[in-house]
A protein has these predicted regions:
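A transmembrane-helix-recognition feature enriched in membrane-embedded lipid enzymes
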Residues: 1-12, 28-48
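Catalytic machinery of carbohydrate-active enzymes
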Residues: 2-3, 20, 196
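General structural signal for alpha-helix termini and helix-helix connectors
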Residues: 12, 16, 212-215
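Short, surface-exposed acidic
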Residues: 14-26
Length: 217
């Protein structure tokens, strides 16, 4: 699967590594990718209890604490780490809160419908990325108790290449849409730090980026 792309990216990201080391990384990537595919398909029948045991959210009380301080809506940022698809079920630990996931529709309609089904099976909702700002303004206005999950490492569209930085030895554009939305609506931002414990088991530690985005540079 996309072998030439994988090899090109590994070589550009780790120029100091030998050919043997790059092949080891390549093998590790494909092993993990295979696990990701199998685990994601498992979402079609895994129980919520089993999912939350395998994708363990360490400190969900952070959201409860912020809600007690008067906040009703939050932005959760995470990357394509571990198995990000599994954490739609883990976030049901947020009591009395709706879970929304911002997603980019797939070109293949059948696969798009499949992934929406898997992501919403435990009661969360999907919002298309182009509708994110409008829908979040509505959620804020309606004072809906909710958390909104963004994948922070998506590549921006050509019209939204506003912020660049060096990442893995390459100039890389990053999304700044969530930052603009958080500042405009004054929504707390939390990063979900994902770790792989062992095969088929992950943990997420919630780390507060800011509870006062309008005051954050």
């Amino acid at each position: 699967y996309r072998l030439n792309v994988v090899r090109r990216n590994l070589k550009a990201s780790f120029p100091e590594k030998s050919r043997k080391e790059l092949r080891q990384l390549e093998r590790a990537f494909y092993l993990h990718f295979t696990d990701y595919v199998v685990e994601t398909m498992k979402l079609s029948h895994i129980s919520l209890e089993e999912l939350q045991r395998r994708a363990f959210l360490c400190n969900p009380e952070m959201v409860d604490q912020l809600m007690n301080e008067g906040h009703t809506c939050f932005i959760l940022m995470m990357g394509h780490l571990g198995n990000w698809e599994w954490f739609s079920g883990s976030t049901t630990r947020f009591e009395d809160s709706r879970i929304y996931q911002i997603y980019r529709p797939l070109n293949n309609k059948a696969f798009d419908e499949l992934f929406i089904h898997l992501r919403t099976r435990f009661g969360s909702y999907c919002i298309k990325k182009n509708d994110a700002a409008r829908d979040m303004i509505r959620l804020k206005h309606d004072k809906t108790r909710c958390v909104v999950i963004f994948l922070a490492d998506q590549t921006p569209s050509k019209a939204n290449l506003h912020y660049w930085t060096e990442f893995l030895h390459q100039d890389t554009p990053f999304l700044n849409g969530p930052e603009r939305i958080a500042s405009k609506l004054d929504l707390p931002v939390i990063y979900l730090d994902t770790r792989r414990v062992r095969r088929g088991y992950y943990t997420v530690d919630m780390k507060l980026i800011t509870s006062t985005p309008r005051e954050t540079p």
